[in-house]
């Protein structure tokens, strides 16, 4: 049987709405919203970010992990 899933609202990039030009790796509270409890970076289709900001977000999270501001994973 086929389920009716309905129309989903288009997600918008929160960085574009706030007009943030640069995503800072030191802004850990904002970066934590885009990481799962296992430490994985959430994909674009779930977060709703545009491609430009998703790439910047990924680089910032990786820098933050390297500087030990964010964990690589939770054991």
Curated annotation (Swiss-Prot):
Residues passing through the membrane, by range: none
GO CC annotation: cytosolic small ribosomal subunit
SUPFAM superfamilies the UniProt entry points to: Ribosomal protein S18
InterPro entries with a match to the protein in the record: Ribosomal_bS18, Ribosomal_bS18_CS, Ribosomal_bS18_sf
Entry's Gene Ontology molecular function annotations: small ribosomal subunit rRNA binding; structural constituent of ribosome
Entry keyword Metal-binding: no
Pfam families cross-referenced by the UniProt entry: Ribosomal_S18 (PF01084)
UniProt KW keywords: Ribonucleoprotein, Ribosomal protein, RNA-binding, rRNA-binding
One of the protein's GO biological processes: translation
HAMAP family cross-referenced by the UniProt entry: Ribosomal_bS18
Family membership noted in the UniProt record: Belongs to the bacterial ribosomal protein bS18 family.
Reported function: Binds as a heterodimer with protein bS6 to the central domain of the 16S rRNA, where it helps stabilize the platform of the 30S subunit.
Subunit structure: Part of the 30S ribosomal subunit. Forms a tight heterodimer with protein bS6.
Name recorded for this polypeptide: Small ribosomal subunit protein bS18
Organism: Desulforudis audaxviator (strain MP104C)
Name of encoding gene: rpsR
